[in-house]
Structures are given as structure tokens and as C-alpha cells.
């Protein structure tokens, strides 16, 4: 799945790779989480644009967003059928620029965070689906979900699903909703090739959303690992579940 990610490349470099019209300036982010505004690239009137959208898709047909569970991920296998995504896959495909993402590996009753990135350290374009929710008073909210697929043998050791990354050579195809129908782009929604991504274990400081600094992506040191071992060994206390759904939740036929 994908529940946190990183953007550290300079804005000018991202603009060159993703080819959007605007030149926004934004600081590096090392711990982007659901419900936060995230950069999104979409085609409007034949031109790529940079937009900010809330991470957590809210379908247009939702009447009361307070009673709806935000959808941060969308399963590639069911996007053509699920009511929450079937319109977006046809008309509102987008890219989310990133430099890597985090995944927690379950091991011996513990969850150890890892930073995952392209081995060539190039930015990645995460496949996204967007929706604009319009409220009863005409207010608009742009929202987005990240598409996931079954993991390959390599990344599968961390988690059974991975975010879909679109190759730059396929950006036009993925973003071109008018030129390419949904069935045509489904072949793009797969896990990356084995060996394309690398990863390393990091500090559990990443677990706290308020922590957002460059130290988060560094490999965990032996000293940090020794200090964190007692904390990881403790039985986690029950926490109130956030109103956010991933592809691992029992979303039923609605989603």
C-alpha cells in the first residue's frame, strides 16, 4: 500500500520531468501523510498543470464527507468497477510526483519502517485518480487517491501491495484521458520491474507525522536500532482508528 511518501527534488527539476506549465516553489517534504495537500499533475485543455489536492479521495456523489471514509489508495484490479473510482479512471487520471515512499514490514509482532526509492534515485510518478467534490453551498474540494497493485517478489518482502509508478515514457498515455480510454491504460497498472527499487530500514521517528526532516530517510544506525528495540517490544496500546481507508480495508462493493 502507500500511506506516506517523500518529495525532495528541487521544484525546477520536477517541472522538467513532469512537464507542467506552472513553476511552483515548495519546500522538501519527508513525511507526507493522508489528508494533507499534495502536488498533483493533470492535463486540462491539452496542457499539463500542477495542482494541489487533498490526499484521500472523496467521490462526487458523497453527500456528507464527515460520514465518509477517505480513500487514500485504489486497487488497480477493481478501479474499472468500483463506484468510487470508475469515473476517475476514465476522466481524471493524474500523477503524483515523489522521490520515494515508506512501508512498514511486519516481523515478529513488530512493524519496522523502510524507505523505498528508485535505485537510480530519480523521481517517480505515482499513478493517481482525482475527484472534485462539490458541497451544498458550491464549495469545491479536489481530492486524490494513489493506485496500488500486487507487489513483485522483491518488494513483496515488505508488503503485498505497492503504489503504481508510471514510466515517463507513458506519462502522455496515462494523463491523456481523451486520447486513451481506461481499458487502454490498464496495462500500466502493475508493480515496478524487480530490481528497479531499493530500500533500507529507517528510524521509527517516521511514525509520527509531525516529524518531517531529512534524517527520516537515512538508514537506521546500530545505536538507534538498539534504543528502539525495547519500544518495539512493548505491546502497542489500542488507538482510535483514523477515518482513512486503504486497499487492505474491507471496503465492500461500494468502493
Regions of interest found by a model, annotated:
Residues 1-255:
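Short linear sequence motif anchored by a di-proline
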